[in-house]
Swiss-Prot record:
Active site: Y165 (proton acceptor)
Keyword Plastid: no
Lineage: Bacteria, Pseudomonadati, Pseudomonadota, Gammaproteobacteria, Enterobacterales
InterPro entries from the UniProt entry: NAD(P)-bd_dom_sf, Sc_DH/Rdtase_CS, SDR_fam, YciK
Domain of life: Bacteria
Full protein name: Uncharacterized oxidoreductase YciK
UniProt keyword annotations, A-Z: Oxidoreductase
Gene designation per UniProt: yciK
Binding site for substrate: S152
Signal sequence range: none
EC number(s) from the headed UniProt entry: 1.-.-.-
Family: Belongs to the short-chain dehydrogenases/reductases (SDR) family.
Keyword Oxidoreductase: yes
Amino acid sequence: MHYQPKQDLLNDRIILVTGASDGIGREAAMTYARYGATVILLGRNEEKLRQVASHINEETGRQPQWFILDLLTCTSENCQQLAQRIAVNYPRLDGVLHNAGLLGDVCPMSEQNPQVWQDVMQVNVNATFMLTQALLPLLLKSDAGSLVFTSSSVGRQGRANWGAYAASKFATEGMMQVLADEYQQRLRVNCINPGGTRTAMRASAFPTEDPQKLKTPADIMPLYLWLMGDDSRRKTGMTFDAQPGRKPGISQ
């Protein structure tokens, strides 16, 4: 996406990023901060979150807060408690990026481990729903709220061996569409399909792939910025490709 935002695009915006300790989430948090946002980091690895917060502080002079939440084990009550803690320190949320995700096993349906399947659904669907439900009151206090989910090409067209991950991303697309319809005038709700990107999750899915042939998280940030800023204000209920035209599968 060719998009050149103004440097103050996200001034006065408060944006929460899940999975903010690594990969795309880390890059998104740093990018949002660079463009003026107050960023809230969410993840399960405190040391990594501290490093990201320190990096943002060094670059922008603003110290982001971070919160620990393990999506694999969290309950609805945990999510509500987190939202209450956030509400003590912040009057609203202008954006939430659901970036955290679990890949699971890439193998035929006949070989899918039922517990791994449950884990993928817990992280990618159940916890994402519970966290969204808890954060909605804060998002609805914004006059320009943007809720962004992370999808995948296998969440639109199922492909062999992508079992639990594909099913979870179909569910993500559905959750986005339902929320967009419920909050048509009050909240933008969309999905981003990042496409093949140079991350640890990608390497585990395609261990033989040359990472140098992939876009970096920084390369795909224009779309992540656009969906959080005012330039996308009328877009809702849609799914966007960060790498339009890219063929799914291993990079050749």
